[in-house]
Amino acid sequence: MPRPSPCADSGGGMMTTLTARPEAITFDPQQTALIVVDMQNAYATPGGYLDLAGFDVSTTRPVIANIQTAVTAARTAGMLIIWFQNGWDEQYVEAGGPGSPNFHKSNALKTMRNQPQLQGKLLAKGSWDYQLVDELVPQPGDIVLPKPRYSGFFNTPLDSILRSRGIRHLVFTGIATNVCVESTLRDGFFLEYFGVVLEDATHQAGPEFAQKAALFNIETFFGWVSDVETFCDALSSTSFARIA
């Protein structure tokens, strides 16, 4: 049975049901946000941080194309689109010093310490690395949020932005599935948001099993998993059913 929207009895909404794992989920697109996580040169382009740190980014182009498709469908359906950019100020104060676990675990910070010539070039606001990829351009009405850690809920206004608009459902795309996408979806789960990830609009940092493990965790414990074609079909005009 489809998981009903908590807003299903509000009246007058346009509901759609998205086929997903482990079961379908019903939601109102206008009370749903599409979250695009960290589609920056750092994570999706050769010469960016992940590439320089030794992660494979050679298969990110189809993900970018799928995100373009999902964004277009979401915008047409009246969904709020929120873009995240991960990174810090040019002096890396926001990244934290030795007293922060982020200092020790961030692969970007470790890469710069190991390769001093990269200092100031990775994930620094204003840098090429920090910029969104050329193919993905926010439009008027979209919201672009910087974030200093993996989760988009940590030290950002995301929660208040969503609650003030009555949004309870979040559809996730972006990189990396097993890091920032999963972290944000998990935090959303703890804050009572319904999270769906579009698996072919995401990409892992690390081997393929990291992608599979993240998707398993999400569909089993924290949310739902679908794909871009199914999402677009659900948002097509023939899929909507007006609530009486």
From Swiss-Prot:
Hydrolyzes ureidoacrylate to form aminoacrylate and carbamate. The carbamate hydrolyzes spontaneously, thereby releasing one of the nitrogen atoms of the pyrimidine ring as ammonia and one of its carbon atoms as CO2. It is an enzyme of class 3 (hydrolase). Induction: Up-regulated by the nitrogen regulatory protein C (NtrC also called GlnG) and repressed by RutR. NCBIfam families: RutB. This is Ureidoacrylate amidohydrolase RutB. The active site is at 38 (proton acceptor), 147, 180 (nucleophile). The keyword Glycosyltransferase does not apply. GO terms for molecular function: hydrolase activity, acting on carbon-nitrogen (but not peptide) bonds, in linear amides. GO terms for biological process: nitrogen utilization; uracil catabolic process. Disulfide bonds: none annotated. It comes from the Bacteria. PANTHER family: ISOCHORISMATASE-LIKE DOMAIN-CONTAINING PROTEIN, PEROXYUREIDOACRYLATE/UREIDOACRYLATE AMIDOHYDROLASE-RELATED. Keywords: Hydrolase. The keyword Hydrolase applies. It catalyses: (Z)-3-ureidoacrylate + H2O + H(+) = (Z)-3-aminoacrylate + NH4(+) + CO2; (Z)-3-ureidoacrylate + H2O = (Z)-3-aminoacrylate + carbamate + H(+); (Z)-2-methylureidoacrylate + H2O + H(+) = (Z)-2-methylaminoacrylate + NH4(+) + CO2. HAMAP family: RutB. Pfam families: Isochorismatase. CDD domains: cysteine_hydrolases. InterPro entries: Isochorismatase-like_dom, Isochorismatase-like_hydrls, Isochorismatase-like_sf, RutB. Its EC number is 3.5.1.110. Belongs to the isochorismatase family. RutB subfamily.
